[in-house]
């Protein structure tokens, strides 16, 4: 059996390793080397590093859909499966039609919920209690293909996007192995997605990160968790941008304008919101490292009554 793998970031690495260990991988497609770090030296993707460690041929098309010679090489491989995990490029129909059993994508949500670029972040931001991975047969749409298998994961009250990322990353490989075996044994019936249940998970940006203090404390807490470790929730203190890394919700209302700092002690900075109170536990000012409030107030003052914007 021939498997071609397409993926790029850390999230795709456990999936690639699982496929190598279980079936072997014929070739790997990943994004071109990019400048990294302060020196801007060209750096390989995490997937490329693993492929080279296992002596697997690596292809790095700038845009696969615009490279007919590379597509021809892919056809000549005659793959049974193309497995796609966070590749970062849209595959044209010509590529989708190549493998015997189709192109299978691992998507980090329980489809049809949270189609798009940032599903695990939006699952937390929107207050979901359960998410997971879905394997699906790819078609020309954006995460619209028939679903194959799902693996559910609980989102706990204080779980961050970074923590959820690592859980889904590690569990993705096992789900892909089960999916491939299930297809080969005719044990999986592809399931159409219900279009009425869809919602989208657009790419994250710094505009999304700005805290609206008129929202409830729970909604803001979800935003903080969903944007940790990147791009991190933001607010303004005296026109200085402050990153908010960690929070908790406290029941009760202060009857103060949303965003007003109510109290400060070593357990956190209490801020009024549209509903209940948000307690900031870890923050970061420009040109400084992130600190727990207990550390921060040792050398800095926070003015009670000040309104965060």
From Swiss-Prot:
A GO CC term attached to the entry: cytosol
Annotated disulfide bonds: none
NCBIfam families for the chain: fmt
The keyword Transferase is annotated on this UniProt entry: yes
Protein keywords: Protein biosynthesis, Transferase
Binding sites annotated in the UniProt record for (6S)-5,6,7,8-tetrahydrofolate: 109-112
Family annotation (InterPro entries): Fmt, Formyl_trans_C, Formyl_trans_C_sf, Formyl_transf_N, Formyl_transf_N_sf, Formyl_transferase-like_C_sf, GART_AS, Met-tRNA-FMT_C
Gene: fmt
Catalytic activity field: L-methionyl-tRNA(fMet) + (6R)-10-formyltetrahydrofolate = N-formyl-L-methionyl-tRNA(fMet) + (6S)-5,6,7,8-tetrahydrofolate + H(+)
Pfam families to which the protein is assigned, alphabetical: Formyl_trans_C, Formyl_trans_N
Its biological purpose: Attaches a formyl group to the free amino group of methionyl-tRNA(fMet). The formyl group appears to play a dual role in the initiator identity of N-formylmethionyl-tRNA by promoting its recognition by IF2 and preventing the misappropriation of this tRNA by the elongation apparatus.
A GO molecular-function descriptor: methionyl-tRNA formyltransferase activity
Enzyme class: transferase
UniProt EC number: 2.1.2.9
Name this polypeptide is given: Methionyl-tRNA formyltransferase
Similarity field: Belongs to the Fmt family.
Transferase as UniProt keyword: yes
């Amino acid at each position: 059996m021939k498997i071609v793998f397409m993926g790029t970031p850390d999230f795709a690495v456990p999936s690639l390793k699982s496929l190598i260990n279980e079936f072997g991988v014929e070739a790997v497609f990943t994004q071109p080397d990019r400048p990294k770090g302060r020196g801007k030296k060209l750096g390989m993707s995490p997937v490329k590093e693993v492929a080279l460690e296992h002596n697997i041929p690596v292809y790095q098309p700038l845009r696969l859909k615009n490279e007919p010679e590379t597509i021809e090489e892919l056809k000549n491989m005659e793959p049974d499966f193309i497995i796609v995990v966070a590749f970062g490029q849209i595959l044209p129909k010509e590529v989708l039609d190549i493998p015997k059993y189709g192109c299978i994508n691992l998507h980090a949500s329980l489809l049809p919920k949270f189609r798009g670029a940032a599903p695990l972040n939006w699952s937390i931001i929107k207050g979901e209690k359960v998410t997971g991975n879905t394997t699906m047969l790819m078609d020309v749409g954006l995460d619209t293909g028939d679903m194959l298998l799902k693996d559910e994961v609980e989102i706990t009250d204080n779980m961050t996007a970074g923590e959820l990322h690592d859980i889904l990353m590690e569990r993705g490989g096992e789900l892909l192995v089960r999916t491939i075996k299930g297809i080969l044994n005719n044990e999986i019936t592809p399931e159409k997605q219900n279009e009425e249940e869809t919602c989208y998970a657009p790419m994250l940006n710094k505009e999304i990160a700005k805290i609206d203090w008129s929202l409830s404390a729970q909604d803001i807490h979800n935003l903080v968790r969903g944007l940790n470790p990147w791009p991190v929730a933001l607010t303004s203190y005296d026109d200085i941008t402050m990153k908010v890394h960690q929070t908790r919700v406290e029941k009760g209302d202060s009857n103060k304008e949303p965003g007003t700092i109510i109290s400060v002690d070593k357990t956190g900075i209490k801020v009024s919101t549209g509903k209940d109170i948000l307690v900031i536990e870890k923050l970061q000012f420009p040109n400084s490292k992130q600190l727990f409030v207990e550390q921060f107030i040792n050398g800095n003052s926070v003015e009670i009554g000040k309104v965060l914007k």
